[in-house]
Amino acid sequence: MIFSTLEHILTHISFSIVSIVITIHLITLLVDEIVKLYDSSEKGIIVTFFCITGLLVTRWISSGHFPLSDLYESLIFLSWSFSLIHIIPYFKKNVLILSKIIGPSAIFTQGFATSGILTEIHQSVILVPALQSEWLIMHVSMMILGYAALLCGSLLSVALLVITFRKNRQLFYKSNGFLNESFFLGENVLQNTYFFSAKNYYRSQLIQQLDYWSYRVISLGFTFLTIGILSGAVWANEAWGSYWNWDPKETWAFITWIVFAIYLHTRTNRNLRGANSAIVASIGFLIIWICYFGVNLLGIGLHSYGSFPSTFN
């Protein structure tokens, strides 16, 4: 009873903080000058991280098993993983661009998990026989950590593509404008050229930083995903007598692995780095959500215990 009450309190606290942080983020999108307001939202995510940690520990103690047995618990753990990846660059200060892009992922995932949409599966239940194994922690935690890291790295790649596209478009417009105005501005030409060069240099540095960190985060996520798939195969052999069954979840996890293996392969070719590899990662972003949510909508296969409630099927 005590743990249930504590879990209820932590859930409402985290949802309240997330609601406030979402509001702050929307305001900062409109007003960039409010630095203190943005910093408050960052601290709010950190507080949410500790609330989620407390929620997971409380649920673990009350249920007697690691909280990764259904969709709700996996969403909470995914939100926790996003928050963990978010706060590391936040404290490093020199990679704040990561926290700005990753932060909203933690916010919206936690907001969805603690909202009333998944109320039916908030209550902890006894594990089904297939999940009563020590492999639960190893397999599912590695998969969720892998999904979180891959999603974050893919978001960085999406941001890279957006900036690259805008950069190329504005370069075209500005170059034409410069050619037209240079005949009339006279002494202002050098000043305009310097401003254009400085802005272009900043964007180039930003693109390089996004490309660098996207590669590092995706590499980490790919490692987690590989460990998760291999441990899942061993667990499947113990539970069902076969390492691989081409279950919908297994199939899409394999497709996800292939897509990001292609991404890492493109990184070995210097000519394919940057926008080309970012396109592959962006495709992987969609594939992960299909694997994580889309397959759950079907509610079939050996992983059907992680599906949506019956009202959503």
Curated annotation (Swiss-Prot):
Its main location: plastid. The keyword Membrane applies. GO terms for molecular function: heme binding. The keyword Cell cycle does not apply. It comes from the Eukaryota. PANTHER family: CYTOCHROME B_B6 PROTEIN-RELATED, HEME EXPORTER PROTEIN C. NCBIfam families: cytochr_II_ccsB. May interact with Ccs1. HAMAP family: CytC_CcsA (MF_01391). This is Cytochrome c biogenesis protein CcsA. It comes from Nicotiana tomentosiformis (Tobacco).
